[in-house]
C-alpha cells in the first residue's frame, strides 16, 4: 500500500504544488489521476519515489517511510518503483536491450553495470520483458530508430525487467496517436492485471480514464477534489475537477477524436 499522510509541496516561489494530501492506494490498483495542467498530478506522482521532495508530511510504502529513507534504504525502495515518462527517458544511441537492462542496475554493483556486465538471468528477464510488450524483434535496434509508441513500450519493458512492484506513468501517451495510445495503455493494464503491479497513471483524457482505471483521482490546485470508482466519475464530477462545464466538454471532445 502507498499512503500519503498530510503531504504538502511548496515550491521556492511560494506556489503550492500539493496541499495537505491524505490518500491510500492499495496494492494492485490501477489508478488514473486527472486534472488540468498544473493541478498537481505530476508532483504527486513524482513524490512517490522522491523525484520531487515534499515540504511537509510523509509518504509510506508497504508500511515503510520513503520520506525518511536514506542511502541504501532509499535505493532499495526505489528499486521497487518503475517510472515511465512522457518523453520515454531512453538512452537513444543504445540498443533496446541495453535500455531494458538498465532496469537491473539497482540489483548490481556500480562497476558491473558501468561495464555492461549482466548475468544470464538478467538477459533472459530482459528478453521476456520485451516479448511481453510485443517488441522482442527490436532488441538489437537503436532506441532512436523506434517510433514513439515503440519507445514507450521499451520503457514498460524496462519497468518489467526491474521487477517493479509499483509503476508510475507520468502522461505516458500524451505524445502518441490514438492507436498507439491504446496499445501502450493495454500493455500497462494487462501487466497490472497479470502481475498485480500497483499502477498509477496521469492522463488528460477523461475517456481514457474511464476506460482503463479501476479508480479515478481528480486534482485541482494541488488538492484532491474527487476520489472514487469509475462508475462514480460522472460528467458533473469531471466538471468540478476541471473547473467548469465548458472545459469539461472540450476535453470530452478531444478524448473521443
Swiss-Prot record:
Catalytic reactions of this protein: phosphonate(out) + ATP + H2O = phosphonate(in) + ADP + phosphate + H(+)
Binding site for ATP: 35-42
EC primary class: translocase
NCBIfam families: ABC_phnC
Protein name: Phosphonates import ATP-binding protein PhnC
EC number: 7.3.2.2
Family: Belongs to the ABC transporter superfamily. Phosphonates importer (TC 3.A.1.9.1) family.
Source organism of the structure: Bacillus cereus (strain ATCC 10987 / NRS 248)
Listed GO MF terms: ABC-type phosphonate transporter activity; ATP binding; ATP hydrolysis activity
Domain ABC transporter: 2-246
Pfam families: ABC_tran
